[in-house]
Swiss-Prot record:
Assembly behavior: Homotetramer.
Cofactor(s) needed: Mg(2+)
Pathway where this protein functions: Carbohydrate biosynthesis; 3-deoxy-D-manno-octulosonate biosynthesis; 3-deoxy-D-manno-octulosonate from D-ribulose 5-phosphate: step 3/3; Bacterial outer membrane biogenesis; lipopolysaccharide biosynthesis
UniProt GO MF annotations: 3-deoxy-manno-octulosonate-8-phosphatase activity; metal ion binding
Pfam family, one: Hydrolase_3
Reaction(s) catalysed by this chain's protein: 3-deoxy-alpha-D-manno-2-octulosonate-8-phosphate + H2O = 3-deoxy-alpha-D-manno-oct-2-ulosonate + phosphate
Family statement: Belongs to the KdsC family.
Source species taxonomy: Bacteria, Pseudomonadati, Pseudomonadota, Gammaproteobacteria, Enterobacterales
Protein's name in the database: 3-deoxy-D-manno-octulosonate 8-phosphate phosphatase KdsC
Amino acid sequence: MSKAGASLATCYGPVSPHVMTKAENIRLLILDVDGVLSDGLIYMGNNGEELKAFNVRDGYGIRCALTSNIEVAIITGRKAKLVEDRCATLGIVHLYQGQSNKLIAFSDLLEKLAIAPENVAYVGDDLIDWPVMEKVGLSVAVADAHPLLIPRADYVTHIAGGRGAVREVCDLLLLAQGKLDEAKGQSI
């Protein structure tokens, strides 16, 4: 790829060399929940129970990332037991819920994991995510993110939140790091 501005064709769509270079160095992937791991809809039952749908392809991608030595963390503005349960199922141990200021959790993660901001990717869908996204090495907005977030992100997924966008990002990181063919996940 010697032409300036040329893109790498992936199974999801084109990816710029600039994004691939940033993705090579990612050691921590931080995800929002509503609108990223889920489609952003919240179903409320008659007894106050909250339901969300999670995509198993995203789960497989997360497991592949974790088994390929990429840490995965969740920072979300809401608090829900089902998110805690989903994280436990996937093996995500870094969970921050009820975060109105996501920078506090971000700083805690950097210190706890001894990771520099340039080695972090963050996937978000709304303006609450931008303060962290502007500090990381690779900022990602899902395809159906808030219109003001999309032009600010380093990469915009080709797939919407809750529909496999996280799997797309996991595959991108693994491809950039030469680990995609050996990655092992689990359909959960």
